[in-house]
Amino acid sequence: MKLATLKQGRDGELIIVSRDLSRAVSAVDIAPTLQAALESWDAVNPQLEERYAQLNSGSAEGAFKLDQRALHSPLPRAYQWADGSAYLNHVQLVRQARNAEMPETFWTDPLMYQGGSDCFLAPTDDIEAVSEEHGIDFEGEIAVITDDVPMAVTPEQAAKHIKLVMLVNDVSLRGLIPGELAKGFGFFQAKPASSFSPIAVTPDELGDAWQDGKVHLPLTVHLNGEKFGEPEAGPDMIFSFPQLVAHAAKTRYLGAGAVIGSGTVSNPDPDGGPGKPVADGGVGYSCLAEVRMVEQILYGQVKTPFMRFGDRVRIEMFDRDGNNIFGTIDQQVVKYPPK
């Protein structure tokens, strides 16, 4: 099943989207918002699934042509947004870039930070930035949305609470990160609002691509119209989504609508190297910080700048038949405040 949120008020209006993303139908009579649906998932899911089947068969009353520009992030705001960092190659590169050591517990204890969830960006909203000097970066990721998760669940139990999957652009201000982390209290100013794909899908919608709590498909990223990366999301993810959810719930409950991220999707070279740009025959990257560090390693100097005002990033995922699964994150960086 595929769900989305029309821009309407602070929490939007829930709609159901056809498998090919061409049509949609309202679901407000079943649940007014996605948050409401998640809070009563077991009760409303059968009705949503029935209408989804009707939509795909062409028999849903009130169906309309879908315009992705009318969509907010599936949850325009959430009670919880916690982002992991489950890809070893990304962790190694960004830590090397700021001369930080790998944590000894990386292989057994996930990295995770708590982000701002009070006002997510829509997938086609501008990324407003105060200054280019802050080091504006995109991060292509995957995230899951849960229902109510009890405290201290096991990964096996956590898997049952994962209801939806979506993509993320976790915007980062790289120039602010070292100073903030040096204080020993984590990210804050360095992590402005994130955006999410216009469509959230149930795990079964991914078919065989959803295995062991991971999405086994490439994440496609374009920067200013040029392919920047297409790393595989599955094989190099050290911790699965059930493990990340269990980690987040180790000492606390997670309320329905909690969003848990994978961290930046990243692949090393087959020989263990840090990866190559698309132009050099590699799978590329899902963020600028990685390519900058690789340039430093390979060429002795950084060639790629961080994002500037007017730059545009596009993040998508396609199935093996070339069909867009989640819709498209398509954002331009603009100066704040606007003139």
Segments and roles (model prediction):
Residues 15:
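Short beta-strand-centered aromatic/proline hotspots
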Residues 78, 133, 250-252, 303-306:
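Short, surface-exposed secondary-structure edge patches
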Residues 1-8, 19, 38-231, 238-243, ...:
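Active-site microenvironments in enzyme catalytic cores
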Residues 313-339:
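Structural signal for terminal/edge beta-strands and the immediately following C-terminal loop/tail
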Residues 211-263, 267-280:
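A beta-strand-loop signature enriched in Asp, Gly, Thr, and Trp
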Residues 260-309:
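Active-site pocket scaffolds in enzymes
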Residues 82, 255, 308-309:
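Residue-level recognition of short, solvent-exposed, well-ordered loop/turn junctions
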Residues 9-11, 88, 149-151, 261, ...:
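Short, charged beta-turn/beta-strand-edge "cap" motif at the junction between a beta-strand
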